A protein has these predicted regions:
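Short loop/turn segments that flank or connect secondary-structure elements
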Residues: 1-219
Length: 219
């Protein structure tokens, strides 16, 4: 592994990142990730969800690569990967449909792993895990530190107390758990500090409010 690939990467100020990723988590925006030449997530055996409203993406993805998404309404589809775990739209290390890529790709941000402390030990995700370890958030003041601690507390709760929550509430994938922790972190805040008395029903309520009537675990 080259020194450049192991070098730390600036992830930005934590509160700034959290304010930007929030809308992406809720499906209301996209993530602005300084990927550089990294394409780890495109080579990590991810199934890519494409919603029926994503007409631009659907127009640029070969229909033969799409198949109905199990458990979702008609019109929701998935795109798979090749025998090496690579997205079929990845050509010579670059996304061939970048300007028209699906929402799943536009909202993916591997900094969620650095933010939450969630580790993806799936062997097919080693490239993503390696890249995620390089990110370093800037904590300029107490607000940054408290918010970061709240996000990590949410992630720890979803892992350590999953048995206290209804079955299937917590996603089975590391990406899903990390994203969910970001989405519900406010439940772990009170009076400018991290709570240590959060109850399961509060977490369930926060998850329900975040997901709405239908919100697929896209990764």
């Amino acid at each position: 592994m080259s020194g450049d690939r192991e070098r730390d990467l600036p992830a930005g100020r934590f509160t700034t990142w959290l304010g930007e990723i929030g809308p992406a988590v809720r499906g209301e925006g996209t993530a602005d990730v300084p990927c550089g030449s990294c394409a780890a997530c495109c080579e990590a055996s991810y199934f890519i969800h494409v919603g029926p409203d994503e007409t631009d993406a659907l127009a640029h993805l070969p229909a033969e690569l799409l198949f109905p998404a199990p458990g979702l309404p008609r019109g929701h589809v998935l795109m798979g990967y090749d025998e090496h775990g690579r997205c079929p739209m990845l050509v010579e290390g670059r996304c061939s449909v970048y300007e028209h890529r699906p929402r799943t790709c536009r909202t993916y941000d591997c900094r969620v792993f650095a933010a939450t402390g969630v580790v993806d030990d799936d062997p097919t995700k080693q490239g993503v895990a390696r890249q995620a370890r390089r990110w370093r958030f800037e904590e300029s003041d107490e607000t940054d530190a408290v918010l970061h601690a709240a996000v990590r507390a949410a992630a720890a709760y979803l892992s350590d107390r999953v048995g206290d929550l209804p079955r299937d509430v917590v996603p089975g994938t590391a990406t899903g758990r990390a994203v969910l922790a970001v989405g519900v972190h406010e439940t772990f805040l009170a009076d400018g500090a991290v709570r240590d008395d959060v109850q399961p029903d509060e977490v369930v309520a926060a998850i329900t409010a975040l997901r709405g009537p239908s919100s697929p675990d896209r990764h």
